[in-house]
């Protein structure tokens, strides 16, 4: 910000991996890491699939859009320890090619398809693979929602509803006790 201060009775921290740094400023450490996921779009292809595609090994996932292009996502192999600032990090032929090889291994018909664009971003992942949607008892008025491991877009409507219920002191529409932050507390 421009140095301005804002106050509220309730604060929601939902900043992906950066949530870890924000909550650390008030003594809360959410054990999580990040990894860089990439996506690509091919030129239009003849119709092949009406379903979402993916592999058990998570080599890639994606679908064919109605107009014919394929949209795929895959891990880049870049992890949190990658020695690059977020401003420097870009998708490139070295990382995108690994995803392309995985896709062609399953769908050889796409071997000659041209890639028209790529993009990527960091995904946040709690160490147990389960997101945190929780009030933080140690900091009254603090609610955290993070660690969605790339599933944020799919779950956002339900998570938004539950966060609004939490802010208003209501019971959530589903039991989210398994998503509480305190599961990371030491039992000693």
Question: What is each of the regions a protein language model found here?
Answer:
Residues 1-3, 57:
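Glycine-centered tight beta-turn/hairpin loop motif at sheet-sheet or coil-to-beta transitions
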Residues 3-4, 68:
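Detector for glycine-centered tight turns/loop "hinges" at secondary-structure junctions
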Residues 4-49:
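Central helical "cap/lid" subdomain
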Residues 16-17, 88, 157:
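Alpha-helix N-cap/helix-start capping motif
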Residues 22-24, 82, 154-155:
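Short glycine-/acidic-enriched loop or helix-start segments at secondary-structure transitions
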Residues 44-141:
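Active-site lid/adjacent beta-loop-alpha segment flanking the redox-cofactor pocket in flavoenzymes
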Residues 101-188:
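C-terminal catalytic lobe of FAD-dependent flavoproteins
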């Amino acid at each position: 910000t421009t140095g301005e201060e804002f106050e509220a009775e309730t604060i929601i921290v939902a900043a992906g991996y950066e949530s870890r740094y924000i909550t650390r400023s008030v003594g809360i450490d959410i054990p999580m890491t990040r990894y860089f996921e990439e996506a690509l779009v091919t030129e239009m292809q003849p119709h092949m699939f009406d379903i979402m595609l993916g592999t058990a090994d998570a080599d890639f996932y994606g679908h064919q859009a109605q107009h014919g292009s394929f949209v795929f996502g895959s891990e880049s192999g870049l992890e949190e320890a990658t020695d690059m600032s977020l401003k420097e990090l870009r998708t490139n032929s070295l990382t995108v090619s690994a995803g392309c090889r995985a896709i062609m291994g399953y769908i050889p018909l796409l071997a000659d398809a041209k890639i028209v664009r790529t993009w990527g971003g960091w995904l946040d992942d709690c160490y147990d693979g389960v997101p945190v949607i929780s009030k933080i008892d140690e900091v009254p008025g603090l609610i955290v929602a993070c660690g969605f491991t790339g599933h944020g877009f799919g779950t956002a409507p339900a998570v938004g509803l539950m966060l609004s219920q939490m802010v208003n002191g209501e019971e959530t529409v589903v039991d989210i006790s398994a998503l509480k932050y305190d599961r990371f507390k030491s039992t000693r």
